[in-house]
């Protein structure tokens, strides 16, 4: 099988061919750290972490770089408003980001470069662009000339003339052409600044990523990823800067995730429907939030509602319950029989389907459907009088492998079941008793007892508590 990636640059799926066999250079645009991240920021963190996980599952060594923009107009303003130094504020929100995405199951990046630590590289990059004729200095500012780069607009599929018609020079700007964008900004009074050949100042946003990519991954990388909103101008400008500088293709594959809507409206501060990731993490199991994010293909918009999140919770519980049921039956299972061959074949086919779905532009929505099918078939298998450890292990290994790629860990619940899972098992036990399937009802009671959960049947229904 071969992996296909939808490339924003060509607007089609392409077979993934890394620059170096067995290795992947991947760069993801991280946050500007002036506040806690909202769920729109959390989506690319989850999506591209999952892409990384699948590439690693397929045997690739992934050099995964995610940057932090730690100096910016918004950061400077926020620092002034709260009376903090810019580096102190940036550190605080870098740590908050890592805490939030860590709770969402995001693996640590290979590197997390920051702008303040890359200043010498940024200045050297800008100097080279000036020497090559792609940029110019204007009274302490430095601007890049998109018209000097022949293929400008190729990522966003816009012509230079179309872009020119909507561009304006703002009051106070020193650029020669409305399309020109800042590589270096002259320092303002009382703002953090760095020394440069053009006087004290700080870099523009776009040049920061180009310099960090070059420093940590080289002139050409395999995958560059980020939110759909970054396609233009940020990623377009990155391409122009980097390819003008290096004379090489900047990135072979460009990946962009879709927007998040809140109750069918685009999330924005002006609408007041701005949802912080950490608020959801505190209110819900973060694994449910991740599961919800992956239930829709990454390129599609996703609509967030509490009802849909609750539905994701129920769906994940179904998978957890199937896994725990398998665990309970394993110890009482026997050796493999001839009748079990069909079940092993079913599990093998499911894993092939999972890989087929993920090979097709990382289709996590379809991969989750495979999980549901496996869970359903596992429950059917457990209804048989005799089960084998080999089949149970096959089911559990398959479910575990898929969940690991999706970044969802349910194994931590093996010793202490989540309350939601306990309730789901009690509900299943009630249904079994109602259908006079007393063997299954007793089996569930015994399983919960082994996990330290004591059931008490009362006239008002079943109550449960954790045993000492």
Curated annotation (Swiss-Prot):
Its main location: cytoplasm. GO terms for cellular component: cytosol. It is an enzyme of class 6 (ligase). The keyword ATP-binding applies. ATP binds at residue 269. GO terms for molecular function: ATP binding; cysteine-tRNA ligase activity; zinc ion binding. The keyword Zinc applies. Its cofactor is Zn(2+). One of its GO terms (biological process) is cysteinyl-tRNA aminoacylation. It is found in: Cytoplasm. Binds 1 zinc ion per subunit. Belongs to the class-I aminoacyl-tRNA synthetase family. This is Cysteine--tRNA ligase. The gene is cysS.
């Amino acid at each position: 099988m071969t992996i296909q990636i939808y490339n924003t640059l060509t607007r089609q799926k392409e077979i993934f061919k890394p620059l170096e066999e067995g290795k992947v250079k991947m760069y993801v645009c991280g946050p500007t750290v002036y506040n806690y991240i909202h769920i729109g920021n959390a989506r690319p963190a989850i999506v591209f972490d999952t892409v990384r996980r699948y590439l690693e599952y397929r045997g690739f060594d992934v050099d995964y770089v995610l940057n932090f923009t730690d100096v910016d107009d918004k950061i400077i303003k926020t620092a002034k408003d709260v009376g903090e130094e810019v580096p102190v504020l940036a550190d605080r929100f870098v740590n908050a980001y890592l805490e939030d995405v860590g709770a969402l199951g995001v693996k640590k990046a290979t590197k997390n470069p920051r702008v303040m630590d890359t200043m010498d590289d940024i200045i050297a990059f800008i100097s080279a662009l000036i020497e090559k004729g792609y940029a110019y200095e204007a009274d302490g500012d430095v601007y890049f000339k998109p018209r000097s780069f022949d293929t400008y607009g190729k990522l966003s599929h816009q012509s230079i003339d179309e872009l020119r018609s909507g561009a304006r020079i703002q009051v106070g700007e020193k650029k020669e052409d409305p399309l020109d964008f800042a590589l270096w900004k002259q320092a303002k009074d009382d703002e953090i600044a760095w020394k440069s050949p053009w006087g004290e100042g700080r870099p523009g946003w776009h040049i920061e990523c180009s310099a960090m990519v070059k420093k940590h991954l080289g002139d050409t990388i395999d995958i560059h990823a980020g939110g759909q909103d970054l396609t233009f101008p940020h990623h377009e400008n990155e391409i122009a800067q980097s390819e003008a500088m290096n004379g090489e293709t900047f990135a072979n594959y460009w990946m962009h995730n879709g927007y998040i809507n809140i109750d069918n409206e685009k999330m924005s501060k002006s609408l007041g429907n701005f949802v912080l990731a950490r608020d959801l993490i505190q209110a819900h199991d973060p694994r449910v939030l991740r599961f919800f994010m992956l239930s829709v293909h990454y390129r599609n918009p996703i609509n967030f509602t509490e009802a849909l999140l609750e539905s994701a919770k129920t769906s994940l519980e179904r998978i957890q319950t199937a896994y725990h049921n398998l665990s309970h039956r394993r110890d009482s299972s026997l050796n493999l029989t001839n009748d079990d061959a069909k079940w092993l074949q079913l599990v093998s086919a499911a894993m092939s389907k999972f890989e087929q779905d993920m090979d097709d532009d990382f289709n996590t929505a379809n991969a989750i459907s495979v999980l549901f099918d496996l869970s359903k078939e596992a429950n059917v298998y457990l209804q048989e009088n005799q089960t084998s450890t080999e089949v149970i292990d096959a089911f559990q290994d398959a479910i575990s492998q898929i969940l690991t790629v999706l970044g969802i860990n349910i194994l931590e619940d093996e010793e202490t079941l989540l309350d939601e899972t306990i309730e789901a098992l009690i509900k299943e036990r009630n249904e079994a008793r109602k259908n006079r399937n007393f063997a299954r009802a007793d089996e569930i009671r015994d399983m919960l007892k082994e996990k330290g959960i004591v059931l008490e049947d009362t006239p008002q229904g079943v109550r449960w508590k954790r045993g000492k």
